[in-house]
A protein has these predicted regions:
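Transmembrane helix exit motif
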Residues: 74-82, 117-143, 232-233, 255-260
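Small-residue-rich hydrophobic segments that form or flank transmembrane alpha-helices
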Residues: 24-89, 151, 166-221
Length: 260
């Protein structure tokens, strides 16, 4: 009963401060976040720019991050037995380094320049990956220690700057030729750890997360849950080959958006 009263109070406060357009955007975003974390990853392509337009570029990162954490927990709860922790551990050290690199250069270098550089790097990696698949040749780079280190660094940097590490992880895991469920499981664990580590940095260094934004996130929890269930249902219906092609196409589109 007390929880219901608190939630109703939160809702009334939010209704007074948000426009109809902002409510529509936040509900759509919460639904898509849930779907993306349980498998339909390409759907996040449209959410980040729409949120930025509705709430502002900086403010939107603080709004979406707690929702991503909620959805990550749901994804991990469902896919917890599938992930390859060896891969997650390889990526995490340089991902954390990427956080602090992002903080260090935040006020020195335009984000767009870094996004373009990483976009071209990912495009090169995509070309190599697709070439190796077409001609049946093994990508020898992926066995090198620096291969995971580079992707971890890019993932940490891009996720800190604009919650945009999805294409980075997609290129890495596609090049590792992981099967559908393992791909989603690794993604879920990696981003759960990474996003939880980002919370104090976003809250206390960049001041992007506020008590008001957390109230809004709490209200969106049921919507995120619905999205997560829809995502699981869709992924179950997709054959392995179709899922891989879908992720490849979405990743290429994401990389192009990073470059332009």
């Amino acid at each position: 009963m007390i929880i219901k009263i608190i939630l109703c109070t939160f809702a009334l406060r939010m209704i007074e401060t948000l426009t109809y357009m902002q409510w529509a955007v936040i509900v759509l975003s919460a639904l898509c976040v849930g779907m993306s974390k349980t498998g339909v990853q390409g759907i996040m392509l449209m959410i980040v720019p729409i949120l930025a337009m509705a709430f502002g570029a900086k403010e939107s990162t603080g709004i979406i991050l707690p929702m991503l954490c909620m959805a990550d927990i749901m994804a991990v709860a469902y896919y917890k037995r599938i992930a390859d922790w060896k891969i997650v551990v390889k990526l995490l050290p340089t991902a954390i380094l990427g956080f602090f690199l992002a903080i260090g250069v935040d006020s020195l270098v335009p984000h767009g320049q870094f996004r373009q550089l990483m976009g071209w790097t990912l495009m090169l990696a995509l070309v190599v990956m697709i070439w190796s698949e077409i001609f049946g040749k093994e990508n020898r780079w992926m066995k090198k220690w620096w291969y995971a280190a580079i992707f971890g660094l890019m993932g940490g940097f891009t996720t800190m700057i604009g919650n945009a590490a999805g294409p980075v992880m997609s290129v890495y895991l596609l090049s590792m030729r992981k099967e559908k469920m393992e791909y989603i499981g690794i993604n879920a664990w990696f981003f759960l750890v990474v996003n939880l580590l980002k919370i104090p940095l976003q809250a206390f260094v960049w001041n992007n997360i506020t008590w008001n934004s957390l109230q809004l996130n709490l209200l969106m929890l049921p919507v995120i849950g619905v999205g997560a269930v829809i995502g699981v249902s869709i992924v179950k219906q997709l054959p392995e080959k179709v899922f891989r092609r879908f992720i490849q196409v979405v990743t290429i589109l994401s990389v192009i958006l990073m470059i332009i």
